[in-house]
């Protein structure tokens, strides 16, 4: 069933027929990979200077902190977000025009949904723009669901099981038609005709806290994304951020040692430290300052992986001081 849906998405992106007709006509007749391969001949030629990143995860990727004025002040069109859901104008934390699903917009927060907040992706993208040549543009595809397990992001996830979840969780999942992986593909297939994928950002773990199977499950999600988009792992690394650190009283900090083992399972992965980054009063989510800091750390890790020389200090001085103080404890 999942292959049928994703195959239909490729047909839709190519403009051949409606999604409903695709599912009815092509139900399992072709492998997903065949359709993805065929789709490459359609659309515009990708711009090699438009660097694309997939951002997935749960509430810390979704963004819990309210953006502040300095965050809303961003207006550089070199950093863009493809809306993964429709945004009504001036709704929730979204201050501005309505956003339509699958369209690109200057990456002013919130990036995920109208009622979400500041995310690691915000300052990841801004930091890259500030450190890369003016010819390079950054685009993010952002799909995140507060409270989700890594299993909810898998290609094999059964949407019929969402009815067993809490009502608030179901409401978020419904915005992605209960299939987050499929929504990632819907966006990514469109974007693949416009730019080139350079990496995947993951921030997830609280809902799988203590589960030593987590690295293997992340690897499954990673491999499926690479295979379905015909990407090479060495060209598209995955970066996984730690949850709120023990030095800030993080209630899920016990997951961080498991996150740190991800490179043992995925050689083209990196884990991003959360040491010293401030959090909110729930000790589950970062504060706005914490999101800025971890976003910069994602960017620094990516630039180091790609051998890109940074032009400036990437982490706030006061955040860095907190990290050093924490290490002395």
Where in this protein do the model-derived segments appear?
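Bacterial Sec-dependent N-terminal signal peptides
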Residues: 1-23, 326-327
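Cell-envelope and extracellular/periplasmic
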Residues: 22-329
């Amino acid at each position: 069933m999942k292959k049928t849906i994703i195959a239909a998405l490729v047909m839709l992106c190519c403009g051949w027929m409606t999604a409903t007709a695709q599912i009815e006509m092509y139900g399992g007749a072709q492998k997903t990979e065949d359709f993805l391969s065929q789709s490459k001949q359609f659309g515009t030629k990708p711009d090699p200077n438009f660097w694309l990143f997939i951002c997935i995860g749960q509430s810390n990727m979704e963004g819990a902190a309210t953006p502040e004025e300095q965050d809303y002040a961003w207006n550089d069109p070199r950093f863009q977000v493809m809306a993964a859901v429709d945004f009504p104008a001036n709704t929730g934390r979204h201050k501005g025009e309505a956003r339509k699903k699958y369209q690109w917009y200057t990456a002013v927060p919130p990036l995920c949904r109208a009622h979400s907040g500041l995310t690691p992706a915000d300052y990841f993208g801004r930091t890259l723009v500030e450190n890369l040549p003016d010819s390079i543009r950054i685009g993010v595809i952002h799909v995140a669901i507060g409270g989700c397990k890594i299993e909810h992001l898998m290609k094999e996830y059964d949407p019929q099981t969402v009815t067993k979840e809490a009502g608030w969780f179901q409401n978020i999942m419904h915005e992605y038609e209960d299939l987050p992986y499929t929504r990632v593909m819907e966006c990514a297939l469109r974007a693949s005709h416009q730019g080139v994928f350079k990496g995947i950002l993951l921030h997830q773990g609280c809902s799988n806290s203590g589960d030593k199977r987590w690295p293997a499950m992340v690897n499954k999600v990673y491999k499926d994304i690479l295979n379905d988009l015909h990407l090479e792992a060495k060209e598209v690394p995955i970066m996984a951020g730690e949850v709120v650190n023990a030095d800030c009283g993080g209630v899920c900090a016990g997951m961080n040692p498991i996150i740190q083992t991800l490179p043992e399972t995925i050689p083209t992965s990196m884990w991003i430290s959360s040491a010293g980054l401030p959090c909110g009063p729930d000790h589950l989510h970062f504060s706005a300052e914490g999101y800025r800091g971890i976003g910069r750390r994602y960017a620094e890790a990516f630039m180091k992986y790609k051998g890109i020389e940074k032009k400036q200090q990437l982490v706030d001085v006061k955040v860095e001081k907190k990290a050093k103080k924490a290490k002395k404890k």
